[in-house]
């Protein structure tokens, strides 16, 4: 018979620690069918969001998880599906048509599924860089990193750790800005690096998806990093003073190996730099 669609918050509360960052908490008392889709995570564990929505025509709750979700993401979705199936007394159907109940869903071989996905990606002849969209930050994979992961003693744990480290990094992820140079008409891509601030910069810069229609790679004549010093109270915007704009590649080449670490195939986390070191780097 017909079952009333559960309020969004009741679906979220079926398993401990799940939240959505798509909507304000005050809205979650409404029926799940009132929402187009929700991005859901278990903060501290999740890396890729689970997309939750109610399909009105099928009278079904749909959960979507990306192909390259981490082990923790998979464990969460199975736990959640099981809890909902138990609550509703319904079966679970995957996208291949296989059916499970609240207990047998735990037999789904997600480890083999994830391993095959990683192997297939590594063997893709067209692979240059592959971007996963985590709930907080993108993660960049390339063949070299995938080989390192697949050659490790526990590839799935290794992969999950790479993704998790990026999602939960406390560093500032510098976002590129573009501006056109008056003299040449060329475009400059510009990042920032502030004194005493852990900062993530790309090894190889690129035009993010949201700028692709406005910025042509062929027009970019330089990639710069604005170095910023703090001259007073760090809580006051006027304390932040630009020192110099240096070439990104030159800056990264000038860093000592102890001053940064690679997060993934393209993102570098630069450890907090002192004012003295920042002023040195302004000369590169």
Which sequence ranges carry the predicted segments?
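Short, highly charged C-terminal tails/helix-capping segments
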Residues: 94-114
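Intrinsic-disorder/low-complexity loop/linker signature
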Residues: 45, 184-185, 267
């Amino acid at each position: 018979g017909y079952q009333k669609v559960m309020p969004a918050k009741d679906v979220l509360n079926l398993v401990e620690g799940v939240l959505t960052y798509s909507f304000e908490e005050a809205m979650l008392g409404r029926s799940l069918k009132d929402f187009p889709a929700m991005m859901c995570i278990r903060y501290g564990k999740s890396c890729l969001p689970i997309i939750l929505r109610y399909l009105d025509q099928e009278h079904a709750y749909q959960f979507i998880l990306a192909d390259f979700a981490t082990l923790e993401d998979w464990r969460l979705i199975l736990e959640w599906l099981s809890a909902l199936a138990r609550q509703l007394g319904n079966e679970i159907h995957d996208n291949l048509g296989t059916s499970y109940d609240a207990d047998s869903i735990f037999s789904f071989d997600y480890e083999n599924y994830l391993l095959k996905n990683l192997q297939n990606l590594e063997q893709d002849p067209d692979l240059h860089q592959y971007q996963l969209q985590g709930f907080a930050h993108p993660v960049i994979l390339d063949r070299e990193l995938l080989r390192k992961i697949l050659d490790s003693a526990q590839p799935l744990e290794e992969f999950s750790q790479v993704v998790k480290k990026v999602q939960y990094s406390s560093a500032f992820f510098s976002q590129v800005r573009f501006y056109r140079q008056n003299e040449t008409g060329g475009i400059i891509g510009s990042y920032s690096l502030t004194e005493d601030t852990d900062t993530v910069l790309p090894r190889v810069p690129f035009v993010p998806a949201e700028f692709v229609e406005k910025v042509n790679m062929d027009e970019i004549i330089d990639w710069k990093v604005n170095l910023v010093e703090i001259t007073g109270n760090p809580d006051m915007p006027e304390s932040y003073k630009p020192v110099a704009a240096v070439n990104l590649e030159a800056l990264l080449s000038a860093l000592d190996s102890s001053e940064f670490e690679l997060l993934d195939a393209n993102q570098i986390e630069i450890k907090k730099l002192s004012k003295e070191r920042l002023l040195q780097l302004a000369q590169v």
